[in-house]
Amino acid sequence: MSWQDKIAQGLQRRRDAAAYRTRQVNEGANGRWLQSGERQYLNFSSNDYLGLSQNDEVIAAWQQGARRYGVGSGGSGHVTGYSQPHARLEQQLADWLGYPRALLFISGYAANQAVLTALTDADDRILADKLSHASLLEAAAHSPAQLRRFQHNQPEALQNLLIKPCQGQTLVVTEGVFSMDGDSAPLAALQQQTSAAGGWLLVDDAHGIGVHGEGGRGSCWLQGVQPELLVVTFGKAFGLSGAAVLCQEPVAEYLLQYARHLIYSTAMPPAQACALQAALRQVQQGDALRQQLQQRIRQFRTAAAHLPLQLGASKTAIQPLLVGDNQQSLIWAEQLRAAGLWVTAIRPPTVPPGSARLRITLSAAHQPEDIDRLLEVLYGLCH
């Protein structure tokens, strides 16, 4: 088989399964609205949970940072790319979340890959929730450690793995809020079991930070848990991009020595770190935004419970409507788009086979009439 045949067959498999991914060129796609071509859509696919991507203070901080520091960092943080804005942001994050240290990464994907590959050796094991994000499962699979996956959000399933002997160290991996189902992990139970077995817990709270907990401190704070490793990302509630790993002092120093994704990547622009400091202030002062988001979630769930579709058991901004069939989910997403509503159909392999869904994400930027319009069209599609 030639390279051309290999590529053609792989593409055809995705087409045959109605799982072919495409990208859409948009003029703007954050907060409440999405502009595509000549048409404006109500955006129910963004992770901009608090609408901060359009916040005037955050935008101004980026602009001011760019004027002072330029638009790039100029190198790895280990060479010339680590500046005062980076150091200030790391300290502010550490103080806010109650950890001695924070390390910045260019993305949540890079942070997860770096931590799992840097910390583990061949005699270690990683025990991961089976529905963990692709960045976690891929990193675990490529790490030198043995990977075992436990049933989603089932502490007893984790316990059955923990009681088995391990020559090295054990790292338990989960998410605070799961990105496709919107449900939350039982973090207190997972931490108790992990600690009792002498292991460490890593929580990726990409979808919880900024939204849950006192002052937006996230899922771990909400559940009274402090994992040994906390990954927070800035592409959701913070409205920007990038990530940080929160940990103890020796762990941070270890990652600075061994985390290749950190050592060999150009650091985020200082201007971005300035904008993230402004976003952090907005998150810390964002109780009204979080309350508004919770109102939108309650409004949607109250009415969506009467739809003839399975509504996920989510109390978060991620509200999945299970369709099942790949092609049907695409048809409904297109019909919603025709009605001026941007909702994404999520299909395998992103989710398990037979669980294609309309993944609806809500934002504090949405107005009550936006939710009403979405529900009106959904009722029309189902009846």
UniProtKB/Swiss-Prot annotation:
Residue list for modification N6-(pyridoxal phosphate)lysine: 236
Family annotation (NCBIfam families): bioF
PROSITE patterns in alphabetical order: AA_TRANSFER_CLASS_2
Organism: Yersinia pestis
Cofactor list: pyridoxal 5'-phosphate
Biological classification of the source: Bacteria, Pseudomonadati, Pseudomonadota, Gammaproteobacteria, Enterobacterales
Residues holding pyridoxal 5'-phosphate: 108-109, 179, 207, 233
SUPFAM superfamilies xref list: PLP-dependent transferases
Positions bound to substrate: 21, 133, 350
Protein name: 8-amino-7-oxononanoate synthase
One Pfam family hit: Aminotran_1_2
